[in-house]
Amino acid sequence: MVDRTFAVVTDSGADLPASLAEELGIRVVPLSIHFGDEVFKDGVTLTAEAFYQRLTTDKERPPHTSQPSPGDFQQVYESLREAGVKQVLSIHLSSKLSGTLQSATIAAREMEGMEIVTVDSRMASMGIGMLAVHAARLAREGRSLQEAAAEVEALRDQFHVVFAVDTLEYLARNGRIGRAQSC
C-alpha cells in the first residue's frame, strides 16, 4: 500500500473482475445472495456463471441479495489499518437500491485512527466499478483523498448506466419495482 495515498474499497455490486481489483489494489466486500435458505457470498462462494446457471434451473427459489453488515466492512477496514493504511475511499452501490452504503458508513464511523470517505455511486454494476478503478488510479498518482472523492463524485454525475432485462419478474418479486409496473 506504500505506493498509494489511500486505499479504495467497493462492494461486489461493482461487478469488477477479480483480476482488475487485485491489480489496482481495490478491496471488494461481497454482498450476500440468497436462493431459498442457501446463502452465498457474491464472487466468493458463488461465481457469476453459477449464479446465472441457477437462475435458469432454480425457478422455484428466485434469488435476492442482502447488503454486507457493518461488521463485514469493519473487517476490511481493520485489515487495511493493520497494513498501515490511514485513509480509505469507499464507493458503493446506490443507496436507492441497497443499504450497502449505510453499512459502510456505520463501519467507517467506528474506525478510530482512520479517515474513511464513503461515496454513494448512485449506480449499480460496472458504473460503480468504473468509479472505483478511477479512484484507484488517482491514489496511484498521489492525489489526496479529498481530491479523489470530489473527482469521483463529479465523474459519477456525468455517468449514465443503462441496462435491459429479459423479464421484470425478478425485479417485481424482490420489491425493486411494483407488481403493477411489471405487467
Segments (PLM) and residue ranges:
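N-terminal glycine-rich anion-binding loop in soluble enzyme alpha/beta folds
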Residues: A7-D72
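Short beta-strand segments
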Residues: V9-T10, S90-S94, D120
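Mixed-charge interfacial surface used for oligomerization/domain docking
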Residues: V2-D3, G13-R27, L31-S32, E38, ...
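A short glycine/small-residue-enriched secondary-structure motif
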Residues: T47-R54, A83, T105-E110
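N-terminal glycine-rich phosphate/adenylate-binding segment common to multiple enzyme folds
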Residues: D72-A104, A108
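Hydrophobic residues in alpha-helical segments
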Residues: L55-T56, R81, A139, A172
